[in-house]
Design a protein with these regions (language model features):
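A glycosyltransferase accessory/donor-loop signature
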Residues: 1-30, 37, 48, 179-322
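Short aromatic/hydrophobic "clamp" motif used to bind/position activated sugar donors
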Residues: 120
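Short, acidic, metal-binding catalytic loop of nucleotide-sugar glycosyltransferases
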Residues: 41-49
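Catalytic metal- and UDP-sugar-binding loop of GT-A-like glycosyltransferases, i.e.
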Residues: 123
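Conserved donor-nucleotide/metal-binding helix-loop-beta segment in metal-dependent transferases, i.e.
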Residues: 127-161
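Short alpha-helix within the catalytic core of nucleotide-sugar-dependent glycosyltransferases
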Residues: 66-69, 115, 130-141, 188
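Active-site-proximal specificity loops/subdomain of glycosyltransferases
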Residues: 64-112
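Short internal beta-strands
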Residues: 52-59, 147-149
């Protein structure tokens, strides 16, 4: 039986304005524009802040990549694009209702990101930033392995994963990652091992595996850093929206869908209108239903074969461990 380990909250490091915030995101052809809207909100809420953006691109459209490059340059920040399409070729696109194989891209970070980079902040594309990220980044230096916010719907997932009743379940849409510890302990290999051993338990991609394999080692963060406002998260007082720094539109009901009326709809639309993707059309429910049907046919998880790029990454991760 696993035991719940108490993970102390790290003390913030001194504010160093010369230290850029290293930010990681991943997008495919469907989500490239939404990654751009997310980053535009980050820059708007953090004027004068320097960012070093690492974008994991899985078949992103050339137009979105050009807009992203121009957006980052105007913000006085730096963009590095890592093409991961070939590395994800062993994965099916049909993971779930609103997830694609790109959800697994962050498992490649130990191999893709510079070895000299000690830590990074990962943000999902379905997030809007409304405040300063420097206070969150200050926590990263003392983070033992991962920092994350508990999932507001986590109780419904724990039984499926076999987690103890006292165990937390974290949302992986915002992660503070200690890259040195991630590499040293071959975390990606641990996650992939669990997915290969438990394909029938996977519903939320690597978020499930992160919780199943690492829940005793994740540092809980305040939900102001990942306020989940999906339609399945329940109602929230308006004051909570005002206090949050990162709004996360969880579940399949995204704010870019036609006639979306969920919590935070106007906030998303306002940031979209102020971004280079202001004319990006909404998606429609019929397309969503077709994709959902195809996902059920394809399957949620295809274990990596010994020759697949992900299996290779797993071997590399184990080889680089202690």
């Amino acid at each position: 039986m696993l035991k719940l380990a108490a993970v102390p909250m790290p003390a913030p490091e001194p504010n160093n304005p010369n230290d850029p915030i290293h930010l990681l995101c991943a997008a495919d052809a469907r989500y490239g524009g939404y990654a751009g809207i997310m980053l535009a909100s980050v820059f708007r809420a953090n004027p004068g802040e320097a960012f070093d953006i690492h974008l994991l691109s899985d078949r992103m459209r050339a137009g979105d990549r050009r807009k992203l490059a121009a957006l980052v340059a105007r913000a006085g920040s730096r963009l590095t694009v890592h093409d991961v399409a070939a590395r994800l070729a062993g994965y099916s696109d049909g993971i779930g209702n609103h997830l694609s194989r790109t959800a697994y891209a962050r498992l490649l970070i130990a191999d893709l990101l510079p070895a000299s980079l000690p830590r990074i902040l990962y943000l999902d594309c379905d997030i809007i930033c409304t405040g300063a990220l420097r206070p969150l980044w200050q926590l990263a230096a003392a983070m033992p392995l991962l920092g994350a916010v508990p999932d507001r719907t986590g109780e419904r997932w724990k039984g499926r994963l076999g987690l103890p009743a006292a165990a937390p379940y974290f949302n992986s849409g915002v992660l503070l990652i200690n890259l040195a510890a991630w590499r040293e302990r071959a975390v990606a290999a641990t996650i992939i091992d669990w997915m290969e051993a438990n394909p029938d338990k996977l519903a939320l991609a690597d978020q499930d595996a992160i919780n199943a394999g690492l829940w005793t080692e994740i540092t809980p963060l305040s939900d102001c850093w990942n306020l989940q406002i999906g339609l399945d998260s329940g109602p929230l007082p308006a004051a909570r929206l005002n206090e949050a720094v990162l709004l996360h539109y969880t579940s399949a009901h995204k704010p870019w869908r036609f006639r979306f009326r969920g919590l935070g709809a106007e906030i998303f639309l306002r940031h979209k209108r102020q971004s280079p993707w202001r004319f990006k059309p909404p998606t429609f429910r019929l397309v969503y239903r077709l994709r959902k049907s195809l996902n059920k046919r394809v399957g949620r998880w295809r274990p990596a074969s010994p020759a697949s790029p992900i299996a290779s990454a797993k071997r590399e991760a184990k080889a680089s461990g202690p």
